Amino acid sequence: MTTLTVVIPVYNAKKYLEECIGSVLDQTFRDYDIILVDDGSTDGSADLCDELASLHACVSVIHKANGGASSARNAGLKAAKGKFVHFIDSDDMLSGSKVYSELSSRAFNADPQIIFFRRERFTEGSREIDAVQPEYEFDGVFSGDVLRHMLEKNYEMTLTCPVNKIFKTDFLKQNELYFCEGIDHEEDEWLPRVIACAQNVWFDKGVFYTVRNRSDSLSATPNEEAAARKACSKIKIAVTGVDFMEQKRLSPDTMPLAAAYYWGYLTDACVDCSRFKSKENKRRVKAELKKNKQFFRSSRYLKSKNQRILGVLFRLLGVSPTVKLIGIRYGK
């Protein structure tokens, strides 16, 4: 068994793929394998994946029909043989050649379920780093209620970004912690579930991952129809998230924090809806709210008076008037 499997979903990323995989191949730590998951690319990325696999024995390729990043990550996770797994985006890269060596010398031996580290970012067109993730307050092994710690510290990036983490493979597979397919913001749905199941993690202050901020990415060029789809996904994340946390029977101290976190997603979706000009887009989001009205009962967990009031308004006034009020209150 290798120590680490690196999973790289690839979709029309020919321009960036060699730099991405090169940052892994340059690592001084050698006990890893790489799985490239070609998600139905049409720009020549599939051929490049095969070429890279022919040149490097540690590289293998999965070719599949296009299903999105979640589907590609799930395919890679199911095929992963390493003790740990690291998901890397095909347009990003590792920060230097000693990332895995440094983590191996301290974090891998602690056998954590999750290893948290920091990331930095540059905007395409300039190689200058323009943002660095703040340090974690904790350094080393952390055992106990990891989700509560994350929510209390408001580590938002930690709850929504998988690339600045390494996961124990068996931990994910045994808990069936796969990505939800067919939604936007799938990382936001996945990570809180993963963290809620973890009891032994490692925080590292090292900056080990570099994000490329692309102006042509789908998330950087939204339109109202796409925004409506994303708003519906936020509602689904809120609903499935609270359901999962209820099934996990979180502690009385943690459940209010988790509920407040997911109510934030629902509130954002309502604000988005209130701004739409298209009646069809408004209707689409409101229909998603009505379909999941059982979520409103979760307001009983909330400690914030403002959020509890929203739950009451949804139940008493209904969806449309409450969405309008939320837009007025929070949409400035």
Regions found by a protein language model. Give the residues of each.
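Cell-envelope/extracellular polymer assembly enzymes that use nucleotide-activated donors
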Residues: 2-5, 23, 33, 189
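Glycine-rich, basic loop-to-helix element that forms the pyrophosphate-binding segment
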Residues: 64-80, 87-90
